[in-house]
């Protein structure tokens, strides 16, 4: 069975490969979030019946992998100061759901 659908104006096509083809992390959907509230809301909805993973990854109740990532992560990690960027990376590696305040605290360390 083939299905097409739109999310936020972007068209997607999905093919049912049958019971022998399971979802894996080889395919994931990336959601760029502007605020912590958006991260929190999506994380709560998608992990209900699903499972949390490391570094902003999760699986929804259907087994589809998602990356729920605040825009701030890219902004902080792309800093020209490699020490600051590495501190942000190290903080993120300790997280499941990404926390913007904790990233900012790692970035701001003297």
Placement of each model-derived feature along the sequence:
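Glyoxalase I/VOC metalloenzyme domain signal
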Residues: 1-110
């Amino acid at each position: 069975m083939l299905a097409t659908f739109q999310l936020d104006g972007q068209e997607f096509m999905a093919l049912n490969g049958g019971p022998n083809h399971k979802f894996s992390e080889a395919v994931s959907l990336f959601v760029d979030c502007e605020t912590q509230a958006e991260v929190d809301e999506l994380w709560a909805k998608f992990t209900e019946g699903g499972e949390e993973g490391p570094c902003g990854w999760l699986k929804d109740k259907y087994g589809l992998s998602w990356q729920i990532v605040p825009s701030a992560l890219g902004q902080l990690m792309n800093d020209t100061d490699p020490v600051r960027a590495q501190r942000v990376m190290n903080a993120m590696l300790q997280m499941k759901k990404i926390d913007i305040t904790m990233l900012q605290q790692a970035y701001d360390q003297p």
